Regions:
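N-terminal amphipathic/basic-hydrophobic helices that include classical n-h-c signal peptides
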Residues: 1-18, 197
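Conserved PLP-enzyme active-site core in the AAT-like
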Residues: 20-42, 49, 56, 66-67, ...
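Active-site-flanking structural segment that lines cofactor/substrate pockets
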Residues: 80-110
Length: 263
């Protein structure tokens, strides 16, 4: 249906309509959506315009950041060739990981199909950095349910607990903020790695901003500078203009089917 046809339909029903009438409004009316509803929606959109603009600008900034990383890593058509999965000289995989390291300002990155999920990536990060006798600390309360078997909160073959790695957690305060007093008490000579879950997951607590995470990391590093601070960044990638690795995180872990995969 052309713009002209829409104007003719409206003219027959409602009388003479100026040529500049919005064809989108005509279509809504054709679908039975009243002007009252449209005006109400327009009022709400106008009220939220500034917020929507902030989100659009942030998304554009992060898109440009990724494009810049691809340019710096000289990504071209040769990097999109099929792969056999053989580990040596996989130019596409190696360059993809270089792009990720550039985007998140890290020394290196692991981005490959052998990592089946975010939980798998977290398991690799934890088991690769913890040894028997070490202790894992969560200063943000209980982690995702899927990590309970990885850590050993629930019994599971191959858990960190089975390998002699202990776990300690400090719950958040009732208002959802960090319990700095008890975090300071929990950090001890065995504490090797601190895991910070950015997303609220299934708990009714706030999701942490990069600024909040940076403050927590600075507090912990002041107590024990050599401790590894890892952030579970799932759902957090690209929602701000900076990432946890920009504020002191030693390592971040995420899922490719969330923000980076644009699902």
């Amino acid at each position: 249906m052309t713009d002209r046809t829409l104007k003719k339909v409206t003219k027959r029903k409602n009388g003479v309509i100026p040529m500049e009438q919005n064809v989108l409004t005509n279509m809504y009316e054709t679908l039975g959506i009243s002007k009252k509803v449209l005006d109400f929606a327009a009022e709400i959109e106008e009220h939220l315009k500034t917020r929507f603009q902030e989100i659009d600008e942030r998304a554009e900034f992060n898109q440009l950041k990724v494009i810049h990383a691809m340019q710096e890593c000289r990504v071209s058509d040769i990097h999109f060739a099929a792969t056999t999965g053989y580990g040596y000289n996989d130019l596409g995989r190696d360059t993809l990981e270089e792009v990720y390291a550039h985007v998140f300002h890290t020394e290196s990155a692991l981005v490959r199909p052998q990592l089946m999920s975010g939980t798998h990536a977290l398991h690799v990060a934890l088991s690769g950095n913890l040894r028997p006798g070490d202790e894992l600390l969560s200063p943000v309360g209980k982690p995702y349910d899927t990590l309970e078997e990885v850590i050993g909160i629930r019994d599971s073959v191959g858990s960190l607990k089975e390998y002699g790695i202990s776990y300690r957690q400090v719950d958040l305060l009732p208002d959802g903020t960090f319990d700095y007093e008890n975090i300071a008490k929990a950090v001890n000579e065995k504490t090797k790695l601190v895991t910070i879950q950015r997303s609220k997951g299934y708990d009714p607590r706030p999701t942490f901003s990069v600024k909040q995470i940076g403050e927590l990391i600075a507090f912990i590093k002041k107590i024990k500078p050599e401790v590894i601070c890892m952030v579970d960044n799932c759902y957090g990638e690209f929602v701000e203009t900076i990432e946890p690795t920009d504020v002191g995180a030693d390592m971040i872990v995420g899922s490719l089917i969330k923000n980076p995969g644009d699902s």
